[in-house]
Amino acid sequence: QDQFQLTEKVVSAEPFGNGHINDTLKVTNEKGEIKYVLQRINHLIFTNVDMLQNNIQIVTSHIRKKLEEKGENDIDRKVLTFLPTKDNKLYYFDGDNYWRVCLFIPNSKSYEEVTPELSYEAGKAFGDFQSMLADIPEGTLGETIPNFHNMEFRLEQFHDAVKNNAAGRLDEVKDLIEEIEKRAEAMCIQERLYREGKLKKRTNHCDTKVNNMMFDTETDKVLCVCLLYTSPSPRD
């Protein structure tokens, strides 16, 4: 209440959702209505909080502009709105932890188990999300977790794990290792083409699960994509 630019008095904050990276709380007003979502950012994973929040600010502003250009209605339910601190920063640091606040999207829900119909809606929504971000210039966003989606780097880690055999179960998974090796060259095509200057880095969500989006409680149509740990990665 004292640190962020909130428009309503809040009286309680309770755990919300089942995320396993950040700690998320739903924040209610005096009428018992959920108005905000407060998160403690896991800075052990996202070590550059400045970059993380700057990425999110760029992405949400870009999407909001695209929606406005399309003449969309109810835009505040179709893109996350993060609130600045009272000194206009994108997050608050209390000396130990990093915090951010966004508006709660009313009449929304998420799903852990999905039907083919929900999966179809989710696929369309992620496609729209990627399309809206396609014209963000390369170099605009920072890489929040370096090499997280770099398959060449991941294969190096894989080969080290095979060599070290720390768990002593190499003989039990030889068929799986062979399967990965068969696919290794194809897995690294994007990184190779990027190095050769044949493929640009573009903006990907990089965690396109159905439970990373909000659905309208009445129509089951997707409202917006969440968990914007967006970083650039090579793709065509």
Predicted segments with their positions:
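Juxta-kinase regulatory segment immediately upstream of eukaryotic protein kinase catalytic domains
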Residues: Q1-E8
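Conserved N-terminal boundary motif of the eukaryotic protein kinase catalytic domain
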Residues: K9-A13
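Protein kinase glycine-rich loop
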Residues: P15-N18
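Conserved ATP-binding subdomain of kinase catalytic cores across diverse folds
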Residues: H20-D23, T28, K35, I41-F153
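ATP-dependent phospho-/nucleotidyl transfer catalytic cores
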Residues: R40, T47-D50, I105-A122, D135-H205, ...
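Hydrophobic HxD+1 residue recognition
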Residues: T208
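Conserved small/polar residues in nucleotide/adenosyl-binding loops
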Residues: Y229-D236
